[in-house]
């Protein structure tokens, strides 16, 4: 992250934490000759460091009878940062709503207005497409090394595809990565979300500290069986 110090100098005030300028409209031609990957890595490093400071501060308030954390805001979708933060080991439990950005805040507003807790059971709150989930058809296509598009049941509330509006593929074989990216028309560095039975997850992945499962695609995890 070669531009990390430049970002702090030009954009971030650390004590007290604040941005030196409004960045919602972008950064213009700042560092116009920078390699985009270097720039992205630097922004990620600064983000993780700033969030770490905030989490440490939050943990100081958590000792008053509750050591759990509810984490929200658009930055809570940053899976790489979430792994770093969880590995700090500051909280017993961490909960992130599947739609932690502005749209998800609407649920909090409703709960606050009604003065009631939300009975959260699942993230499938959107439009419903009726019918049986096509398990056998999906298995058949995956065995033939094909990609499968699924649109069944109620849509996920949030930006993550969690099974009801999803593209599924067999992860075995390097060519599948390029095929998924081609169909989605996205960059080659984009991440993928594995789906695995909860009881088998520790056999294949090294989850962050305190994370027993991640059903809403909120953390990165190291694969423990090589490349």
Name each region found by the language model:
Residues 68-85:
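Glycine-rich phosphate-binding loops at beta-strand->alpha-helix junctions
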Residues 1-25, 29-30, 82-227:
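Flexible beta->alpha loop and helix N-cap segments adjacent to enzyme active/binding sites
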Residues 46-48, 77, 131:
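A general structural motif
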Residues 42-66:
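Phosphate/ATP-binding catalytic cores across multiple sugar-kinase/actin-like superfamilies
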Residues 38-42, 67-68, 93-100:
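A short glycine/serine-rich beta->alpha loop
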Residues 31-46:
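Short, surface-exposed alpha-helical recognition segments that flank or form part
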């Amino acid at each position: 992250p070669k531009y990390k110090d430049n970002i702090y100098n030009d954009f971030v005030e650390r004590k007290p934490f604040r941005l030196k300028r409004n960045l919602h409209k972008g950064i213009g031609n700042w560092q116009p000759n920078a390699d985009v990957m270097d720039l992205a890595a630097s922004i990620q490093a600064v983000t993780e460091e700033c969030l770490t400071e905030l989490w440490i501060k939050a943990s100081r308030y958590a000792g008053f009878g509750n050591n759990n954390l509810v984490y929200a805001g658009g930055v809570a979708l940053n899976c790489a940062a979430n792994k770093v933060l969880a590995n700090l080991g500051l909280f017993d439990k961490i909960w992130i709503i599947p739609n932690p950005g502005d749209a998800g805040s609407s649920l909090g507003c409703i709960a606050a207005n009604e003065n009631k807790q939300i009975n959260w059971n699942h993230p499938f709150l959107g439009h419903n497409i009726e019918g049986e989930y096509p398990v056998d058809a999906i298995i058949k296509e995956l065995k033939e090394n094909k990609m499968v598009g699924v649109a069944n049941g109620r849509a996920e509330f949030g930006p993550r595809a969690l099974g009801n509006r999803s593209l599924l593929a067999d992860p075995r074989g390097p060519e599948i990565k390029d095929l998924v990216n081609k169909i989605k028309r996205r960059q080659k560095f984009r991440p993928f979300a594995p789906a695995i039975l909860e009881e088998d997850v520790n056999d294949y992945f090294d989850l962050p500290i305190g994370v027993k499962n991640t059903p809403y695609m909120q953390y990165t995890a190291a694969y423990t069986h090589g490349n």
